[in-house]
């Protein structure tokens, strides 16, 4: 009886893992449809941003499934949902990322500070420059709690559940109105995911 239950559980785990792998593969394929557009726009601009990073950010933001694929409306207009076409979204996203990367170079901080600043805003780069010059989860969480959330109305440190493979090891929560302090780590993870799946697809 117990052996049968164990077999069923193992089978269920394998089926779930297979389904998730399939979904991730489909998401990667969707994101990769923007590769030519990203490549073209990067070639038009003097930028330290690279194709792999931009694609990983698209994966993180929307998995390529919305008009504003890089969720760049707010950086362009100060309001959300003002961009609804992919080209404008990617162009604005690259412009914002480029500004962050150049500011990060100027301040002597790491590239992942610039990536996290895509979610928090460029003032985060100054914060990291004054606190060790390297983006860490602890500093991102502190900035979310003490700067971003209060600025947007959450002065009590109120949190909400946030389930993600990275967050589950760090409390599985975010601050209300505090942005996403896991953002740069998610982009890094998604960069590796895209590399792995595209390598697998190429070799296959």
From Swiss-Prot:
This is Pneumococcal vaccine antigen A. Pfam families: Lysozyme_like (PF13702). GO terms for biological process: carbohydrate catabolic process. Its main location: other. It comes from Streptococcus pneumoniae (strain ATCC BAA-255 / R6). SUPFAM superfamilies: Lysozyme-like. It comes from the Bacteria. It is found in: Cell surface. PANTHER family: LYSOZYME, PNEUMOCOCCAL VACCINE ANTIGEN A. The gene is pvaA. InterPro entries: CwlT-like_lysozyme (IPR047194), Lysozyme-like_dom_sf (IPR023346). GO terms for cellular component: cell surface.
């Amino acid at each position: 009886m117990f052996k049968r239950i164990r077999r069923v559980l193992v089978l269920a785990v394998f089926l779930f893992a297979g389904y998730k792998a399939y979904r991730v593969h489909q998401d990667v394929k969707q994101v990769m449809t923007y590769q030519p557009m990203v490549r073209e726009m990067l070639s038009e601009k003097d930028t330290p941003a690279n194709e792999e990073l931009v694609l990983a950010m698209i994966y993180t933001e929307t998995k390529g499934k919305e008009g504003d694929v890089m969720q760049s409306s707010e950086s362009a207009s100060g309001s959300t949902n003002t961009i609804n076409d992919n080209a404008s979204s990617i162009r604005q996203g690259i412009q914002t990322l480029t500004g962050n990367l150049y500011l990060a170079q100027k301040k002597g901080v790491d590239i992942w500070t610039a990536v996290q600043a895509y979610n928090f805003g460029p003032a985060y780069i100054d914060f990291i420059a004054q606190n060790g010059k390297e983006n860490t989860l602890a500093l991102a969480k502190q900035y979310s709690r003490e700067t971003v959330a209060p600025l947007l109305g959450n002065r009590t440190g109120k949190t909400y559940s946030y389930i993600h493979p990275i967050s589950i090891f760090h409390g599985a929560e975010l601050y209300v109105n505090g942005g996403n302090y896991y953002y740069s780590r998610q982009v890094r993870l998604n960069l590796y995911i895209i590399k792995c799946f595209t390598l697998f697809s190429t070799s296959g």
